Amino acid sequence: MKHFLLLAIIGILFLGSTYGASVATEKLKASNCTKTEGFQAIACVLRMADFAQKIEKLDMDDKNQVNEFEKSCVSFANCFETLQCGPEDPAEKKINNMIKNYCDAVVYVAKDFADCSEKLENKNSTCYQNWDPFPDAIDEETDEKKKEKMLQEACKNYFGKDNCLKKEITEKCSETEWKGFRDHFIGISNILLECDFRNIQ
């Protein structure tokens, strides 16, 4: 599960670093922003690399590491929010929300979903073990028509073939566990995919 969570944060950090550099420049140019605030924006962008390293090294079975990761999530997400100069930027807000949703999902999987995850692994659930909501092949595809079809297929199977994760999690754990899992992963789906989950119960 950590593999695709890492893919998701790479998506956020790519957006954040590309966009963040321009934010920092705009903060410096804005008439009501000080140079200090502009450099603080640049520092936020530079912290993305450190944040990515923490994710790569994170042992989701180590509660102390997860707690430290949770603290760094809050600190990182608040980085741009502390800058009070200039108008609120919708793109900046979107990236902050993506980071928050991602962090919530990682902490949820490591803490709240840990027992259910263990049950599914002990059961050797094929659906759970083969679950790959962000297939690598999508990024590697250069043909736009094929890529569009792959994205549609990824959305259709986001919770496993024929929505099999709902059945697996509900039967092995509970409906409450399924709803928590569903809600957290819908929250991070818009990082790499644009899916319509209105019919997912």
Curated annotation (Swiss-Prot):
Membrane-crossing segments per the record: 4-24
Sites where a glycan is attached: 32, 124
Positions on the Extracellular side per record topology: 25-201
Keyword ATP-binding tagged: no
Topology, Cytoplasmic side: 1-3
A GO-annotated cellular component: membrane
Entries under InterPro entries matching the protein: T20D4.11-like_dom, UPF0376
Coiled coil: none
Keyword Transmembrane assigned: yes
Keywords: Glycoprotein, Membrane, Signal-anchor, Transmembrane, Transmembrane helix
Main subcellular location: membrane
Bilayer topology: Single-pass type II membrane protein
Subcellular localization: Membrane
Family the entry assigns: Belongs to the UPF0376 family.
Protein name: UPF0376 protein F10G2.1
Protein's organism: Caenorhabditis elegans
